[in-house]
Amino acid sequence: MSRYCVIGSGISGATIANLLSEKNSVDLFDTAKGPGGRSSFKRIDKAKGFDHGTQYISPKSLAFKKFVNFLIKKKILKKWRGIHLFLNKAKKENKNHLKIIGRKGNNDISKNILKNINCYFQTELKKIDYKDKKWVLTFSDGNRKIYEKLILTCPFAQLSKLSKEFIKAPFIKKKVKMDANITVMFSIKKTNNKDERQLIEEKNFE
């Protein structure tokens, strides 16, 4: 049994950690407060929150479709039947385009497949060393941990900074620009006032 460390709790990191855990010891680390990565969920209280990463998933491959259908049967995912506006005038809308979301949030996939994995959140990997055929990892809280195997699923900028000393493949030297994305998240309280309800409905369709 090997001792693995996986950096990143998005769908890729969570899937890798889950598969490796069948025959190995696995720890997973992420800088965020919880799992999800690019499909993270921003909670504003115990009952409400926002999907501020992935809006939905639309499985294409047969293997992924089977996995998604399995999670739908387990009531972890569901079909998104809300009202959607297709605004791309240069492309024809696919009326049969399937939209799948988490029942509680789009990080439900990661949460489900990581439920039996040792996860450490709000912990950033700052430095990697390789000594005596082991990976020595230094984290933002000053802790150092040693692993036989290391898998990085973090964004490219972080990956390049941490691993360029060890990865000799040409891709690591590429300059990948990641554009900032501004997301506005707001909630509206329900009201019994007819005029206020009408104003909200009008604003939603402007």
List PLM regions with ranges.
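N-terminal FAD cofactor-binding segment of flavoenzymes
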Residues: 19, 40-84
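Short beta-strand to alpha-helix junction loop
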Residues: 56-62, 89-112
